[in-house]
């Protein structure tokens, strides 16, 4: 099985890190410019340009791919199925115009010129809003085009908006909200190995916002402890040899840990230990 991941850029390291955390450790010594073996002899990682990964999967060069939704949509490939939002690389594809222009809405671009690295998404967007524009594909420095009279506006990726502000561009509309996705072809989405990879990556994401709590509690306080814990399916309770205390374990949301610990102490729990969870298969 072959997994296509970005070979460089802001998505490269997070993609590799996610695979490592999921247990698909990359084997040292492989030609990491093109591909890498993993500890699973049936799984190989292929490195490709983020924009090319949808085609790799669609053409059968890879079984699954990891890249941004913006790249999948721009590829305009019909037989790709999204398996999972991998929850990183979040950004927006926006329509923007110079701050000093009179453009306030998308309709002000009628018969105008738009520069973008995403011509297919851009044309579909303007078709949807029924505005006639001339779309020019560029391969970089999109933000400069309105200032050198190449375009009246741009459609480009932004994460924080800083680059747009630096180039005196204002957002007119949001075209697409994007993040990194795991996807496959329709005919391989139900493949057992594909499902295993999907489950492994999902287990990392599920664990990210959870914490594992362990504590001791008097038996007569158990009901109160259970009431406090917002755990998954109730806590695990075990006897402690030679003690009248019980060991209570539970998985809780990370954002609830602070208040939960305080409440647990109030009802008699002690020796509370909080640990991170590497993976959680729900």
UniProtKB/Swiss-Prot annotation:
<dbReference type="GO" id="GO:0000287">
    <property type="term" value="F:magnesium ion binding"/>
</dbReference>
<dbReference type="GO" id="GO:0005524">
    <property type="term" value="F:ATP binding"/>
</dbReference>
<keyword id="KW-0808">Transferase</keyword>
<dbReference type="GO" id="GO:0003879">
    <property type="term" value="F:ATP phosphoribosyltransferase activity"/>
</dbReference>
<comment type="pathway">
    <text>Amino-acid biosynthesis; L-histidine biosynthesis; L-histidine from 5-phospho-alpha-D-ribose 1-diphosphate: step 1/9.</text>
</comment>
<dbReference type="InterPro" id="IPR001348">
    <property type="entry name" value="ATP_PRibTrfase_HisG"/>
</dbReference>
<keyword id="KW-0479">Metal-binding</keyword>
<keyword id="KW-0547">Nucleotide-binding</keyword>
<keyword id="KW-0328">Glycosyltransferase</keyword>
<keyword id="KW-0028">Amino-acid biosynthesis</keyword>
<dbReference type="InterPro" id="IPR015867">
    <property type="entry name" value="N-reg_PII/ATP_PRibTrfase_C"/>
</dbReference>
<dbReference type="GO" id="GO:0000105">
    <property type="term" value="P:L-histidine biosynthetic process"/>
</dbReference>
<keyword id="KW-0067">ATP-binding</keyword>
<comment type="similarity">
    <text>Belongs to the ATP phosphoribosyltransferase family. Long subfamily.</text>
</comment>
<dbReference type="Pfam" id="PF01634">
    <property type="entry name" value="HisG"/>
</dbReference>
<keyword id="KW-0963">Cytoplasm</keyword>
<keyword id="KW-0368">Histidine biosynthesis</keyword>
<protein>
    <recommendedName>
        <fullName>ATP phosphoribosyltransferase</fullName>
        <ecNumber>2.4.2.17</ecNumber>
    </recommendedName>
</protein>
<keyword id="KW-0460">Magnesium</keyword>
<dbReference type="GO" id="GO:0005737">
    <property type="term" value="C:cytoplasm"/>
</dbReference>
<dbReference type="InterPro" id="IPR011322">
    <property type="entry name" value="N-reg_PII-like_a/b"/>
</dbReference>
<dbReference type="Pfam" id="PF08029">
    <property type="entry name" value="HisG_C"/>
</dbReference>
<comment type="function">
    <text>Catalyzes the condensation of ATP and 5-phosphoribose 1-diphosphate to form N'-(5'-phosphoribosyl)-ATP (PR-ATP). Has a crucial role in the pathway because the rate of histidine biosynthesis seems to be controlled primarily by regulation of HisG enzymatic activity.</text>
</comment>
<dbReference type="InterPro" id="IPR013820">
    <property type="entry name" value="ATP_PRibTrfase_cat"/>
</dbReference>
<dbReference type="InterPro" id="IPR013115">
    <property type="entry name" value="HisG_C"/>
</dbReference>
<dbReference type="InterPro" id="IPR018198">
    <property type="entry name" value="ATP_PRibTrfase_CS"/>
</dbReference>
<dbReference type="InterPro" id="IPR020621">
    <property type="entry name" value="ATP-PRT_HisG_long"/>
</dbReference>
């Amino acid at each position: 099985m072959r997994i296509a991941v970005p070979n460089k850029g802001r998505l490269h390291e997070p993609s590799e890190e996610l695979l490592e955390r999921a247990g698909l450790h990359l084997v040292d010594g492989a030609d990491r410019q093109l591909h890498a073996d993993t500890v699973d002899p049936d799984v190989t990682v292929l490195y490709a340009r983020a924009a090319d990964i949808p085609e790799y999967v669609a053409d059968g060069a890879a079984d699954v791919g990891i890249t941004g939704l913006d790249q999948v949509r721009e590829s305009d490939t019909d037989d790709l199925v999204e398996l999972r939002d991998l929850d990183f690389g979040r950004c927006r594809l926006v329509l923007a115009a110079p701050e000093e222009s009179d453009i306030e809405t998308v309709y002000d671009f009628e018969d105008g010129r738009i520069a973008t690295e995403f011509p297919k998404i851009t044309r579909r967007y303007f078709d949807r809003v029924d505005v006639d524009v001339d779309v020019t594909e560029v391969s970089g420095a999109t933000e400069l085009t309105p200032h050198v009279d190449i375009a009246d506006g741009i459609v480009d990726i932004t994460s924080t908006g800083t680059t747009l502000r630096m180039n005196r561009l204002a957002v007119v509309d949001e075209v697409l909200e994007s993040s990194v996705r795991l996807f496959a072809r329709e005919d391989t989405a139900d493949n057992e190995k594909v499902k295993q990879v999907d489950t492994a990556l999902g287990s990392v994401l599920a664990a990210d916002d959870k914490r594992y709590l362990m504590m001791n509690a008097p038996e007569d306080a158990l009901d109160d402890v259970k009431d406090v814990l917002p755990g998954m399916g109730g806590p695990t309770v075990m006897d402690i040899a030679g003690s009248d205390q019980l060991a209570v374990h539970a998985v809780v949301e990370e954002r609830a840990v602070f208040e939960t610990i305080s409440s647990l102490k109030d009802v008699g729990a002690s020796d509370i230990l909080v640990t991170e969870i590497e993976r959680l298969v729900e």
